[in-house]
Amino acid sequence: MALPIIIDCDPGHDDAIALVLALASPELEVKAITSSAGNQTPEKTLRNVLRMLTLLKRLDIPVAGGAVKPLMRELIIADNVHGESGLDGPALPEPSFAPQSGTAVELMAKTLRESAQPVTIVSTGPQTNVALLLNSHPELHTKIARIVIMGGAMALGNWTPAAEFNIYVDPEAAEIVFQSGIPVVMAGLDVTHKAQIHAADIERFRAIGNPISTIVAELLDFFMEYHKDEKWGFVGAPLHDPCTIAWLLKPEIFTTVERWVGVETQGKYTQGMTVVDYYFLTGNKPNATVMVDVDRQGFVDLLAERLQYYA
């Protein structure tokens, strides 16, 4: 039986590729997609979900827009990474269908309520919508199998010296998720910075030769430009968000540890930092499965294999 999932995302190039991967995978049943504000404004990320589903001919999947700003802060966006539209690069279709009239939280709650089995929530943007769901519907916690997030880092941040972007945008929401008691799987920068796509990989995807693999290659062409900055020391571009879907499909290509994670919401220098108790110093019981390594070639091979689905 396919694993039921809800995807909450803020497309974003890597979010878009995560959607491509999920919808090419019969092991997963994508029951709903909700948009969060993060990589771009809430209007643009919602539009980008609709554009991607139009491209992928999946107008059957319910879509709803989420919170327009973080729980307690003003919105920060990453237009320097993802461009004016949030998906700059390829020519994507205009949306051919409309989102549902309700909110992301309402769609998530309805999906959980109606599912015969617990649902995995995959969140590849800030955690605002997921936190709102958890706070407003405690009766549905048992319907959530796990929450798989792209966010955080044990070591270095990518938006501040201490903080990864998704967590930094809404640290209060992330703290709610980590302390919810629901199993959390964290794909942080420690693993996503190892899931780099190289120039040769992009050409491999392009050579697959179907319309979707071509779009993915063009998304990556644009995404590579930001990551060429020497400060990062990257060979290619880290494909953050697809690590969440890849872990669901092939957990064996990832190395994980069970640890307690908290989110710093107050620090002068460390707001948005995910504090990972790697050496069990706090005495707190682990609340997260933390990805620490990935077989990069296995990750690339999985993407290439699933892009064949769109032939």
From Swiss-Prot:
Give the EC number: 3.2.-.-
Against InterPro entries, the record matches this protein to: I/U_nuclsd_hydro_CS, Inosine/uridine_hydrolase_dom, IUNH, Pyrim_hydro_RihA, Ribo_hydro-like
- What sections of the sequence does the record tag as coiled-coil? none
Keywords linked to the UniProt accession:
Glycosidase, Hydrolase
Any one cellular-component term (Gene Ontology): cytosol
Pfam families, per this entry?
Answer: IU_nuc_hydro
Active site, renumbered: H240
Enzyme class label = hydrolase
Q: Which Gene Ontology molecular function entries are recorded, alphabetically?
A: purine nucleosidase activity; uridine nucleosidase activity
Q: Does the keyword Hydrolase apply?
A: yes
User: Which GO terms of type biological process are on file?
Assistant: nucleobase-containing small molecule interconversion; purine nucleoside catabolic process; pyrimidine nucleobase metabolic process
In terms of superkingdom, the source organism counts as Bacteria
Report whether Hydrolase shows up as a keyword of the record: yes
Against SUPFAM superfamilies, the record matches this protein to: Nucleoside hydrolase
Q: What does this protein do?
A: Hydrolyzes cytidine or uridine to ribose and cytosine or uracil, respectively.
Similarity comment: family membership? Belongs to the IUNH family. RihA subfamily.
What is the name of the protein in this document? Answer: Pyrimidine-specific ribonucleoside hydrolase RihA
Gene encoding this polypeptide?
rihA
